[in-house]
Swiss-Prot record:
Name by which UniProt lists this protein: Photosystem II reaction center protein I
Membrane topology qualifier: Single-pass membrane protein
Complex formation: PSII is composed of 1 copy each of membrane proteins PsbA, PsbB, PsbC, PsbD, PsbE, PsbF, PsbH, PsbI, PsbJ, PsbK, PsbL, PsbM, PsbT, PsbX, PsbY, PsbZ, Psb30/Ycf12, at least 3 peripheral proteins of the oxygen-evolving complex and a large number of cofactors. It forms dimeric complexes.
Classification of source organism: Eukaryota, Viridiplantae, Streptophyta, Chlorokybophyceae, Chlorokybales
GO (cellular component) term, any one: photosystem II reaction center
SUPFAM superfamilies: Photosystem II reaction center protein I, PsbI
NCBIfam families, A to Z: PRK02655.1
Organism: Chlorokybus atmophyticus (Soil alga)
Gene name of the record: psbI
Transmembrane segments: 4-24
Primary location class: plastid
Highest taxon, organism lineage: Eukaryota
Localization annotation: Plastid, Chloroplast thylakoid membrane
Gene Ontology biological process: photosynthesis
Length: 38
C-alpha cells in the first residue's frame, strides 16, 4: 500500500512539474527573446 502511494505521488509530481515546465517555457516564447533563438 505504501509503495502504491509513493508511485501515485511520483506520477502526480511528475505531471505537475511537467505542466509547470511547459507553462514557463511558453512564457518566453511570447517575449522578444524568441528572436534570439531563431
Amino acid at each position: 500500500m505504501l509503495t502504491l502511494k509513493i508511485f501515485v505521488y511520483t506520477v502526480v509530481i511528475f505531471f505537475v512539474s511537467l505542466f509547470i515546465f511547459g507553462f514557463l517555457s511558453n512564457d518566453p516564447a511570447r517575449n522578444p527573446k524568441r528572436k534570439d533563438i531563431d
